Amino acid sequence: MFKTILSLIFLPIRILFQFFRILSWAIRKGDHFYLEIPSSFSFDKRSFFVRVLVGKEDSPFLLDFLLGLKALSTVPGLKKISFQISNPEYGFGEVWNLCKAIESLNEKGIHTSGYCLGGGTKALLLLSHCKSRYASSASEFFPVLPSAEPFFFGGTAKKLGVGVEAYASGAFKAFGETFQRTSFSQPAKKNIESLLSDQKALLEEGFLKSSGLDLKILEEPILSAERLKKLGFLTDLLEEDQFEENYLFETYKKEKEDSKPDYRDLKPKGLRLYSKKKNFTYLSRPVPTVIVLPVQGNILPDLGREEEFRSRQVSFRYYQETFKELREDPRISAVVLEMNSPGGSALVSELLYREIKKLSEKKPVITYVLNVAASGGYYLACGTKEIHGTPYSVVGSIGAVMLRFEMKNLYEKLGIKKERIGFYPHRDILSEYGKLSTKSEQFLKREVLHSRDVFYSRVTEARKTSTKELEAKWGEGRVFLGETFRKAGFLDSCSSVLEILQKVKEDLKAEKIDVRYLPGTYNWKDFIQDMKPGLQSIGLNLPFWNGKNLKYNPNEVLYLSDIASDLSQ
């Protein structure tokens, strides 16, 4: 009410500003927009200290970038957009959303043109969705089709005298096999092969539909621009400066110095001006606020009192406090969780699930799986009203696992002995020295199966399925692509994030919504942690040591899928 009264008081001034916008737009409007698709997107914002220290500009948020593309599609008279495509460092979830946005521009009759100096499969997929495609005559592309080559340390562990005991809830929960074996078990291997096959099928469909490029061409490890031009994939070969400087000319070639451009340039300032002009209303009325909250990284076992955000990690206290604030803020009408987590601590997964359920009781909460919601990530999603994703999202891994390292033989090789004093039943579980008693083994198996049963109950409640159906086809640690999971009823749709926001707007029965991205702050602690020298073992998939030196308790039950995170990239 107060806002409406203020808008009435200042209405004459606001109308005057709107008049100037109309005049300025008449001068600034153009029919061509030049835009760089960045190589990375941010999930957090940098603190002032980090910005000063690093000095680099932050990468944009994916959501902001997509909303910008949507705004471009509404500009009257816009005929063409030239995209400078950097080689993507993000996952197929981001790429698919960008491809959908480019498709939407094409459908609106806006000609999209792309230029890429080089890159891999993702760069080619983005380029493929543009109507005109360009590269330098010197450009080379290095495509890699869906495949996997994981490390196995079973032989090394045996030589060192390290025993690895895995207690898994199903044959497909292959988390411990990396350390126990020299290859995957047949069930786990078959599941991964099926997922990779589905990924290839999606890529094949994407390339054929957008540009007609046969996926078999991408089996060649090096593709020159000359070859892609002969195949008809590239429209022409241009140097980068030609594309950057001559984008107002139809063919990106300026015949003469005084040649008249074919297009009129629309600058970012002009786009912002048009958006303000378009969104002007005589009366300022409140619109529903929709929060998009990124949930990014492994779910940590930390239950300390510290509430600070941790970059690329899901910490309990930070999200507990965030969910509480969202729950209690009357201005917020709905929440979308942007999920990118392979899981982690079973205990923290359950605690955060309960916090999400509390939030869901107050307002609509939806999960959007960008790249991965496996194990604990999917567990969290089950606390929301709906679960959506992309066809490329890696989902599932419904089950539990626990690892225990037995170091006695290694210690003895090094001349180290440990003596057990005052041990009681099951105390050996907390020791890495010696094998477990039969009773302790049975205890751990029961704990893992109990955690699995709780997980199953969360899924069956959220997705209205039976435990029998879940275990027979979709549980026991299996991983799937989003499209497969959607057909089985475990995702509500495979949609772009913009389509999900449109659905939220319709569900709220609102003409407009105010979409706000709510990232955490990457502060000096995160920066120093990232700068620490040491073993960065992400590439080796070592489960108890991540890039930030935060360890899982080896006696803790995990809802975690290490392979899912890799496959999503």
Label for each model-derived stretch:
Residues F2-L16, A26-R28, A201-L208, L215-L218, ...:
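C-terminal alpha-helix plus adjacent terminal tail
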Residues L8-L11, K29-F61, P288-S315:
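STAS-typified acidic loop motif
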Residues G55-L78, F309-I332:
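A short, well-ordered alpha-helical element
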Residues Q84-A225, S341-G482, E506-D507:
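Conserved catalytic cores of soluble enzyme domains
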Residues L160, Q199, L203-S211, A225, ...:
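C-terminal long alpha-helix characteristic of the crotonase
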Residues S284-R331, P519-Q569:
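Intrinsic disorder and flexible/low-complexity segments
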